[in-house]
Amino acid sequence: FFFQAEDGIRDYKVTGVQTCALPIFQGTGTEGRVTKKDIIAFVEAKKSGSAPIKTVGSTPSAAPSTSASPSVSLGGDVEIVEMDRMRKLIADHMVMSKQTSPHVTSYVEADVTNLVMWRDRVKKSFEKREGEKITFTPVFIEAVVKAIKDFPLINVSVDGTKIIIKKNINIGMAAALPTGNLIVPVIKNADQLNLLGLTKSVNDLATRARANKLQPDEIQGGTFTLTNVGSFGNVMGTPIINQPQVAILAVGAIRKKPAVIETPMGDAIAIRHMMFLSLSYDHRVVDGSLGGTFLRRVADYLEQFDENREI
């Protein structure tokens, strides 16, 4: 007897078994196909006189549901905690994003020594004058806004086969909540704010996000998102796109590292402040050339930051 095996083995010969002796039964292969192991098991069962293999009737069995989550073994010492409403929304949104957008992530390392020196110089006087602290986040956002102006096809969304180019630049900034959940307040028209305006917007939204005092419209309408994984001490990340946007930037921790720099006397090794930037983007509309060039441009703006700048 000959049969076509699911596992790619064709014309496998089982001696001593006639075609008419084989019942129709459910195989263990893909979609119930009969495999070589199934035939051998049938022959051995026939020889030993053990319980027959369960046959399949004329009515096909229902296909298993693909939407149900795989069962999880609850053996051992476990505690079951129901997701709260926000965690359920986040979970659904993350799964939907991965199913919608083919994600690609590019990385670049940036020398932000000038930026660190600038902040060290202005942070005390800024806090004394404004009554609030200045972080690196508004500078990151400023660099992103400049790069989006250079590459507007990053600031888009997708509707079927249509690319919707957004004229407003609304930057979402992912913020961790005391509960462990995540929220993304949005700085609307970030391109119309100077560095002082961005700093005040970042501080205001972050403070009210932690206090659960954001308005609904303040977490909607983003066109690009920034997430600071460096705040957890992480050096880089592979962020998931915040739908319906097509790109998200993760900024890593700033660390002192030895690096090669160019001097009038030639190359030299110096201690520099370095960080990684990682950009995840939707490969349906953002190719590696656009994504990589945009990311490099953001890094260039950070590296070229004027440490003598006033705010």
Model-predicted regions and their roles:
Residues 1-20:
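Single conserved hydrophobic/aromatic residue that forms the stacking wall/gate
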Residues 16-17, 28, 218:
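A short glycine-leucine-enriched loop at secondary-structure breakpoints
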Residues 33, 37-38, 42, 46-311:
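C-terminal catalytic/motor cores of large multi-domain enzyme assemblies
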Residues 23-33:
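Short acidic, glycine/serine/threonine-rich helix-capping segments at coil-helix boundaries
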